[in-house]
């Protein structure tokens, strides 16, 4: 198979559609599959349908597996649905990829899989790939289980598998009432770029690099989040006075925030570290807190063109509240 051919699962979702659009603009042959119809979806059906998946997998060189039930689905779907989609669906894709001779498999996971390990009691938790997961809900538990299954399939078959634990990149409002009531949405997202958010365009870049580097890497798991300005020496003060830490790194930040009526969070409980992804994949995320402040100073939208193009999709056909991932 000399020509690249991608199968993108979850192609009607936020990341999946962004991947399909990006690949098609680059002239790459790509097929989108999703349980819901959408402009980037060629095959409508479940990834747990092994016959459908085997047919869709034929001739593919790479799989970008973004399809999942997310945290917002916890209140609307039984646990069995999470097992069917996140575990059985992933296994179906992995085994079909092995049978089809796929060259690389990229699995979109989540930093939520770290679960209870994310919150540091006396100082901000420093979250790298070495931190052990302690799942706290069915979403995190099934994503972690699917990661482990992917590792087993890699060990048994040699299928190159790269797991990307992505931080927040959704455009929807935060699901925490206190956060929504106290801060403007753009204020929230700007703050999060310091420690727990990544732009959609950078997530797309990470997936495409993972697909490219997968065959030489074989197996790996990476944290995908904007590059933090912080160091481990900041961890204690981030828990008690993050505003002082941020102002030390960015002296212009207090003035830029004051001009908009914005404020920093009273505490930062974790920091995601992306160093391994940058080193191994050659990933160079472009959207970080430095860029956010530069955009604020220039009175420009700090989102990437791709993020603005995709907008918000939500997680339910009939929303009943605020949903995040």
Segments the model singles out, each with a brief description of its role:
Residues 156-180:
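Flexible, glycine-rich beta-alpha linker
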Residues 45-87:
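NAD(P)H-binding glycine-rich loop region in Rossmannoid oxidoreductase-like domains
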Residues 84, 88, 120-161, 189-190:
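Catalytic helix-loop patch of NAD(P)-dependent Rossmann-fold dehydrogenases
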Residues 91-136:
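Conserved Rossmann-fold NAD(P)-dependent oxidoreductase catalytic core, especially the SDR/UDP-sugar
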Residues 35-49:
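Rossmann-fold cofactor-recognition segment
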Residues 6-26:
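N-terminal Rossmann NAD(P)H-binding glycine-rich loop of SDR-like oxidoreductase domains
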Residues 205-269, 274, 279-280, 303, ...:
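Mid/C-terminal beta-alpha module of Rossmann-like enzyme folds, strongest
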Residues 172-187, 193-223, 227:
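Alpha-helical substrate-binding/gating segment
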């Amino acid at each position: 198979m000399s020509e690249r051919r991608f199968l993108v699962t979850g192609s009607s979702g936020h990341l999946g559609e962004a991947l399909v659009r990006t690949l098609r603009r680059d002239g790459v042959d790509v097929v989108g599959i999703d349980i819901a119809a959408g402009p980037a979806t060629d095959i409508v059906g479940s990834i747990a349908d092994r016959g459908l998946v085997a047919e869709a997998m034929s001739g593919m060189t790479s799989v970008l597996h973004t399809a999942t039930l997310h945290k917002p689905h916890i209140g609307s779907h039984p646990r069995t649905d999470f097992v069917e989609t996140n575990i059985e669906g992933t296994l179906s894709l992995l085994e079909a990829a092995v049978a089809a001779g796929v060259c690389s498999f990229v699995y979109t996971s989540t930093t939520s899989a770290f679960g209870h390990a994310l919150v540091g009691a006396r100082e901000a938790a420093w979250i790298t790939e070495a931190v052990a997961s302690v799942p706290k809900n069915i979403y995190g538990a099934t994503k972690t289980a699917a990661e482990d299954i992917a590792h087993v399939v890699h060990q048994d078959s040699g299928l190159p598998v790269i797991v990307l634990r992505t931080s927040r990149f959704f455009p929807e409002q935060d699901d925490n009432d206190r956060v929504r009531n106290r801060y403007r949405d753009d204020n929230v997202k700007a703050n999060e770029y310091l420690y727990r958010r990544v732009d959609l365009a950078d997530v797309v870049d990470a997936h495409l690099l993972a697909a490219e580097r997968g065959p030489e890497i074989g197996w790996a798991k990476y944290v995908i989040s904007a590059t933090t300005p912080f160091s481990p020496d900041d961890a204690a003060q981030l828990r008690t006075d993050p505003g002082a830490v941020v102002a030390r790194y960015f002296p212009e930040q207090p003035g830029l925030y004051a001009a908009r009526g914005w404020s920093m969070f009273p505490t930062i409980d974790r920091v995601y570290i992306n160093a391994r992804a940058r080193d191994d994949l050659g990933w160079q995320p472009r959207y970080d807190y430095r860029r956010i402040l530069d955009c604020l100073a220039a009175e420009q939208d700090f989102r990437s063109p791709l993020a603005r193009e995709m907008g918000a999709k939500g997680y339910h056909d009939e929303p009943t509240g605020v949903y995040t991932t």
